[in-house]
């Protein structure tokens, strides 16, 4: 015997290798097969003891030093970043749109992360095979490669809470530590691990409860149900052999299996490991097995369809509660699933491409006949190989062979030199044709501000016919022409019109620097900023406006612009008759002339609407001679005063913003009687008495002292006390003097006051007023008076030069003086402010006699600035002809927008100042320039183009010195070149370092210059400031809404051309031409950024910067052509498909999502087409009835298999092994219900009723009629509430509702399940109680006596009903005879 054992021991093979968990399972199963359970358990005890001893001796511990980073990580990350930079550049050039960029970026980083993961294993094996991290991660005991990869490799891409990829990868690993940004992104991804473990455990418990609820009544009750169906379990190419073996073992064969004429396995044979080995040996192809899916029973299962019992390895016994076992088998690992989810939570693992890298430097060679030229999905050229391809790389010393699998892309040429670790091939991930994809909307937001233009026609989407959503029919570019928009409040720059150039300087250091958008509307008042001229900055550079402190609040319907250079003594108006309008320039002071008067300046007053009526004040001048700083009273003497204008025409806010009417005097002088006024609160104590006389600097109240001495008058009112101090003298008159009791008297100089004691003669005007104290003798207060003589006003001859006065035919301008306060009205001056008593106004009128102008009641004013020969002059232009108002409307065609004439009757509230259409046409060098101004919306926005938005391509150097000489020569001929180069394109001074200057150029017109010849003479091109907006096809487009654009002088920089290069390349440059980045304009130079030509000169171009975005067909564009875009606005929406990443909702949530049959967010675009094609093809092949029948059957079968595979995939990804039969029992229950449809009426079931699939088929066969139903997927919860037992349903949830419904319907519970018997305290029909249940059901079958009784009762009832029917019919016949 010992000899025999020794021989057997000699035959055994000695294995010397590491054994993992899978190999251990195999060993145990082989030991059980050979030696039985008892001997195997003895061996395993020894193995356990050995393991503990070795682990104790080794004393493996995990320290931070054991986490070894991978040396190749640095250059791998650099390589990925380099690819990302190239991708970013292509996106910037407009070659790649945002979605492509996102996809490629994700693929680049995923491939890098995966390659790093593979390198990690190799690195550990070569450098430190006994590393504790390496031993633990690959032993299968704890942890996996993905977690170690995050520790020592890189965390990689994360998903956000919505499941979308964050395209910024985490390049660090946990050993190196994360940056702040990476940490925040990491928190996004690891969101699932933050939730408390207790919550997760309760989730798993609830899942188990629902699972058991659905299948608790499933018990093995028969040996064979007699089914003749089977489900294919043949090995597939994509299926691993291990999974295939696991799927087969434990099932029963459905059909005999033949290899040729020989039967190697019979029907209903149990499949064990021996039979599986025989299948592998004979390579059996068509294997069909029995599963719980095909069992013919409705509420139980047979032994052969279930297969082996998982406990003893034999066929399952009768009475086994396999449903409860299945529910617990799936629910129990749920706790592990949830707890394990934390480690890889959020890390993206997708099925993207895998790269093959060259092992060393060398020349690559492959067989060119085996590959075909193609392009990758990103459009890059490549070679496609259909079969296995061997690639050789010849280095100096060694020859490397690399095997490329089929359907891969070769990314290099044959015989090309490659560097080590260079990507030479791309292996596509094996994705099935029916892999689920989801439809994703990606919104692209603008990262800059400006105007939107597109380079192709667009269609309106039907649901947004009147909106701003457009659909692109073909690939095109969206251009964002640079500029800084400012939201207008509807009245901004109402004086400034198209082509006005402004230089804006903020000189105030006390305020923060503000731009034009600082016009804020609050409480229907607009805080206005004043325009004032700094005389020190006048010169050839133009005039500079100063946005200084807000001057005052003015009414919302009137705008005052202070412009201090107008109407000075040395300034003059110029009015010339130009086609029914006159132009008034405001010239600044020239050199050598007198300095301007120190005054607050002239204010131009033009309403917000731009409408001027007859006798309207065009401008006014506040003379400093008529300005007072204290309170007082104005007196006109005894002359009557009449009001000139209505209250609403002239509105002035000052002081307490009281509305005051303006008056006109008929005398040459008026008087101002000064007085000191103090307004004190009613509760304050006054330290002087009424009618007392005080001196200067006397304390009259707490913290209040008098500035002058004199008589004190105190008037007490409800809430305040008014204290006045009258300076002057006090006289006690004699009995003969009579003075009015009520009002005072103005006395001219020279009058004498005589009595016995004194005689006095007054030199100036005085104001005499009688004062009567209580119970005392009255006295007289004599107060000094300030006399003002009003001059005749400014002579028009001094304002206008003589030659222009003769030409102002229909213009009437007159100077009128207004006194702003009424006769005797008290004027209250606030401290430290001055009061203007008289205002000089320029009143506008036009000729009444002229027939053309006499009927015009309103004219339209606008502000114009004209430049010529570097001299800038400003004008107010008043159009005496009412312009024609046009509406901007949409046409039905796709050509853009057109102008639709409108009589204006339906738009009475339109702002005429903006809705005016100006069209100018003139011919210049065979080019036509068109200008049109569109109707603005209520709040028209502005666009400011600043120096960062445009660029300058510098002077061209062709042959060095020759070019310089030519440049000097051209400067001699045209000295304006030097000035232009210094001032910038618009002739303004360049930016000074210490001065915050902003130069603006206003336009809201679109000018098209079709053909513009390049000219040598710069002086002929003064219209270069004109601005255009056109599309690429040369059509004038009328944008909606119209915008006001402010272009900066420094935004429009020069691009100098040389005549030699122009002649050789082209002869015509068109305005509006769009250039891509690095595109070549002319022969010797490509310019830096993308942009659009704004101005063409003889030797240069001004180009406006533009940002372009690529948009593919089907993309949705938001916004109109020419609309102003703000940063962060949605530009375009792409709709694209992406594969669903199975890792995003992993663990228990994924299982629950599948079992509860929750609808996914979106389905693939091609899925519906596939289903329609399937229906058409199968009905063509099999005919209509059979096609639909088989199609429906296949759909149910396929959906069941798909659900099982999805759940198994989640569990396998977490390393949990569950047999298919458990999942199949659950899936069978949630797919076994059908919904009765309303298409065909049935006597058996009502429409909308949920019934079992087998019950519906059997009922249809029994009644011999078709029952129309459709298959339905019920979730776990719904399936629990739709069982045959209402007691089971009520014990699950919604107890009251379920019991009430069951009572109303009269439902019967046959107590077939476990739960209902437990609730009622009966014996459960499983295990030992199963035999009693079978015996009881047989007794139910023995009911012959009951049948006889029932038949007797039925016969008697039928006879009674028949007798009654005969009586009823005879009565009816008798009645008919009577009536007939």
Curated annotation (Swiss-Prot):
Signal peptide region: none
GO BP annotation list: DNA-templated transcription
Enzyme class of the recorded protein, top EC level: transferase
Assembly mode: In plastids the minimal PEP RNA polymerase catalytic core is composed of four subunits: alpha, beta, beta', and beta''. When a (nuclear-encoded) sigma factor is associated with the core the holoenzyme is formed, which can initiate transcription.
Cofactors required: Zn(2+)
Binding site for Zn(2+): 225, 295, 302, 305
The protein's role, per its UniProt record: DNA-dependent RNA polymerase catalyzes the transcription of DNA into RNA using the four ribonucleoside triphosphates as substrates.
A Pfam family hit: RNA_pol_Rpb1_5
Name of the protein in question: DNA-directed RNA polymerase subunit beta''
GO MF annotation terms: DNA binding; DNA-directed RNA polymerase activity; zinc ion binding
UniProt family annotation: Belongs to the RNA polymerase beta' chain family. RpoC2 subfamily.
Cofactor note (record): Binds 1 Zn(2+) ion per subunit.
């Amino acid at each position: 015997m010992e000899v025999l054992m020794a021989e057997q021991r000699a035959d055994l093979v000695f294995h010397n290798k590491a054994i993992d968990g899978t190999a251990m399972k195999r060993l145990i199963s082989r030991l059980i097969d050979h030696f039985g359970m008892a001997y195997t358990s003895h061996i395993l005890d020894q193995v356990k003891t050995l393991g503990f001893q070795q682990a104790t001796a080794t004393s493996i511990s995990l320290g931070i030093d054991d986490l070894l980073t991978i040396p190749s990580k640095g250059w791998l990350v650099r390589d990925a970043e380099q690819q990302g930079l190239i991708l970013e550049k292509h996106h910037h050039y407009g070659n790649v749109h945002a979605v492509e960029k996102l996809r490629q970026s994700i693929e680049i980083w995923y491939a890098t992360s995966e390659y790093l993961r593979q390198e990690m294993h190799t690195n550990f094996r070569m450098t430190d095979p006994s590393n504790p991290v390496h031993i633990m991660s690959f032993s299968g005991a704890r942890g996996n490669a993905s977690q170690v990869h995050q520790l020592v490799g890189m965390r990689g891409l994360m998903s956000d809470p919505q499941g979308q990829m964050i395209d910024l990868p985490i390049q660090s690993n946990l050993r190196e530590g994360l940056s702040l940004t990476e940490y925040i992104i990491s928190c996004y991804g690891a969101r699932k691990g933050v939730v408390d473990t207790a919550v997760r455990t309760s989730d798993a418990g609830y899942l188990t409860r629902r699972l058991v609820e659905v299948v608790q009544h499933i018990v093995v009750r028969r040996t064979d149900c007699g089914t003749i169906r089977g489900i294919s379990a043949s090995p597939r190419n994509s299926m691993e052999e291990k999974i295939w073996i696991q799927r087969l073992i434990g099932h029963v064969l459905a059909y005999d299996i033949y290899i040729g004429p020989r039967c190697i396995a019979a029907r209903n044979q149990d499949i064990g490991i021996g039979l599986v080995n025989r299948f592998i040996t004979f390579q059996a192809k068509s294997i069909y097995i029995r599963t719980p899916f095909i069992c013919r029973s409705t509420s139980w299962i047979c032994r052969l369809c279930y297969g082996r019992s998982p406990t003893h390895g034999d066929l399952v016994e009768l009475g086994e509660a396999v449903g409860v076992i299945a529910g617990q088998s799936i629910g129990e690992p749920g706790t592990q699933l949830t707890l394990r989810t934390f480690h890889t939570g959020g890390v993206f693992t997708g099925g993207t491409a895998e790269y093959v890298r060259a092992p060393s430097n060398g020349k690559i060679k492959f067989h060119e006949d085996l590959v075909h030229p193609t392009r990758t999905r990103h459009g890059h050229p490549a070679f496609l190989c259909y079969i296995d391809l061997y690639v050789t790389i010849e280095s100096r010393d060694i020859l490397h062979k690399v095997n490329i699998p089929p359907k891969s892309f070769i990314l290099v040429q044959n015989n090309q030199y490659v560097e080590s670790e260079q990507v030479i091939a791309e292996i596509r991930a094996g994705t099935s044709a029916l892999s689920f994809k989801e439809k994703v909307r990606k919104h692209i937001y603008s990262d800059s501000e400006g105007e939107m233009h597109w380079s192709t026609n667009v269609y309106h989407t039907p649901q947004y016919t009147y909106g701003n959503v457009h659909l692109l029919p073909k690939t095109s570019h969206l251009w964002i022409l640079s500029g800084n928009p400012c939201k207008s409040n509807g009245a901004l720059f109402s004086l400034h019109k198209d082509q006005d150039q402004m230089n804006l300087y903020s000189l105030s250091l006390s305020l923060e620097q503000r731009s034009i958008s600082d016009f804020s509307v609050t409480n229907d008042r607009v805080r206005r900023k004043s325009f004032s001229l700094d005389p020190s900055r006048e010169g050839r550079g133009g005039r500079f406006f100063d946005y200084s402190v807000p001057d005052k609040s003015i009414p919302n319907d009137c705008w005052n612009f202070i412009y201090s250079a107008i109407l000075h003594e040395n300034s003059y108006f110029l009015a010339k008759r130009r086609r029914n309008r006159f132009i008034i320039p405001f010239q600044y002071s020239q050199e050598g002339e007198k300095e301007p008067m120190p005054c607050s300046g002239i204010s131009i007053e033009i309403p917000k609407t731009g409408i001027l009526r007859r006798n309207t004040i065009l401008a006014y001048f506040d003379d400093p001679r008529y300005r007072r700083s204290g309170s007082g009273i104005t007196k006109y003497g005894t002359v009557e005063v009449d009001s000139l204008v209505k209250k609403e025409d002239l509105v002035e806010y000052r002081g307490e913003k009281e509305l005051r009417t303006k008056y006109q005097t008929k005398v040459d002088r008026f008087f101002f009687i000064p007085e000191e006024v103090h307004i004190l609160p009613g509760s304050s104590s006054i330290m002087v008495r009424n009618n007392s006389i005080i001196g200067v600097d006397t304390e009259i109240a707490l913290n209040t002292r008098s500035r002058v001495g004199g008589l004190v008058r105190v008037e007490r009112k409800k809430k305040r006390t008014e204290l006045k101090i009258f300076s002057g003298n006090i006289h006690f008159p004699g009995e003969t003097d009579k003075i009015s009791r009520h009002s005072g008297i103005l006395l001219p100089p020279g009058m004498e006051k005589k009595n016995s004691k004194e005689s006095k003669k007054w030199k100036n005007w005085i104001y005499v007023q009688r004062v009567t104290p209580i119970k005392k003798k009255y006295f007289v207060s004599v107060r000094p008076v300030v006399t003002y003589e009003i001059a005749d006003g400014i002579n028009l001859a001094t304002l206008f030069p003589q030659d222009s006065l003769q030409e102002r035919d229909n213009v009437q301008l007159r100077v009128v003086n207004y006194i702003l306060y009424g006769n005797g009205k008290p004027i209250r001056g606030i401290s430290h402010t001055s009061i203007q008593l008289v205002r000089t106004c320029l009143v506008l009128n036009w000729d009444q006699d002229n027939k053309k102008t006499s009927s015009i009641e309103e004219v339209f004013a606008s502000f114009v600035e004209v430049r010529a020969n570097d001299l800038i002059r400003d004008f107010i232009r008043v159009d005496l002809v009412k312009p024609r108002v046009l509406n901007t409307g949409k046409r039905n065609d796709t050509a853009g927008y057109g102008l639709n004439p409108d009589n204006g009757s339906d738009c009475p509230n339109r702002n005429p100042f903006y809705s005016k259409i100006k069209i100018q046409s003139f011919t210049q060098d065979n080019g036509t320039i068109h200008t049109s101004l569109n109707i603005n919306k209520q709040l028209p926005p502005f666009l400011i183009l600043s120096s960062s938005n445009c660029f300058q391509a510098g002077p061209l150097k062709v042959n060095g010195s020759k070019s310089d000489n030519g440049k000097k020569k051209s400067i001699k001929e045209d000295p304006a070149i030097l000035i232009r180069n210094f001032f910038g394109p618009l002739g303004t001074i360049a930016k000074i370092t210490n001065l915050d200057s902003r130069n603006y150029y206003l336009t809201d017109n679109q000018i098209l210059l079709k053909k513009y010849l390049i000219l040598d003479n710069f002086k002929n091109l003064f219209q270069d400031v004109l601005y255009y907006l056109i599309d690429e096809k040369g059509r004038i487009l009328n944008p909606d809404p119209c915008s006001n654009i402010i272009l900066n002088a420094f935004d429009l920089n020069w691009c100098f051309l040389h005549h030699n290069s122009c002649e050789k390349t082209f002869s015509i440059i068109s305005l509006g031409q769009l250039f891509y980045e690095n595109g070549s304009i002319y022969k010797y130079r490509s310019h830096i950024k993308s942009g659009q030509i704004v101005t063409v000169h003889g030797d240069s171009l001004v180009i406006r910067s533009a940002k372009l975005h690529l948009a593919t067909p089907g993309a949705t564009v938001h916004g109109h052509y020419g609309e102003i875009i703000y940063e962060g606005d949605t530009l375009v929406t792409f709709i694209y498909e992406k594969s669903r990443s199975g890792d995003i909702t992993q663990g228990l949530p994924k299982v629950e999502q599948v079992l509860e049959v929750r609808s996914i967010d979106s389905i693939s675009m091609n899925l519906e087409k596939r289903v329609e094609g399937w229906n058409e093809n199968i009905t063509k092949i099999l005919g209509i009835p059979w096609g639909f029948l088989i199609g429906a059957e296949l759909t149910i079968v396929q959906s069941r298999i798909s659900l099982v595979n999805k759940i198994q995939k989640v569990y396998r990804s977490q390393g949990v092994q569950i047999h298919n039969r458990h999942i199949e029992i659950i899936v069978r229950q949630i797919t076994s219900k059908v919904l009765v449809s309303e298409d065909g009426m049935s006597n058996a079931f009502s429409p909308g009723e949920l019934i079992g699939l087998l019950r519906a088929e059997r009922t249809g066969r029994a009644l011999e009629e078709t029952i129309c139903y459709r298959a339905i997927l019920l979730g776990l919860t719904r399936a629990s509430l739709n069982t045959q037992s209402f007691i089971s349903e009520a014990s699950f949830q919604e107890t009251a509702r379920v019991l009430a419904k069951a009572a109303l319907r009269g439902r019967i519970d046959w107590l077939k399940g476990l739960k209902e018997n437990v609730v009622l305290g009966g014996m459960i029909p499983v295990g030992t109680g199963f035999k009693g249940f079978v015996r009881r059901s047989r007794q139910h079958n023995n009911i012959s006596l009951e049948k006889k009784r029932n038949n007797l009762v039925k016969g008697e009832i039928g006879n009674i009903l028949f007798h009654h029917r005969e009586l009823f019919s005879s009565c009816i016949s008798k009645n008919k005879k009577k009536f007939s």
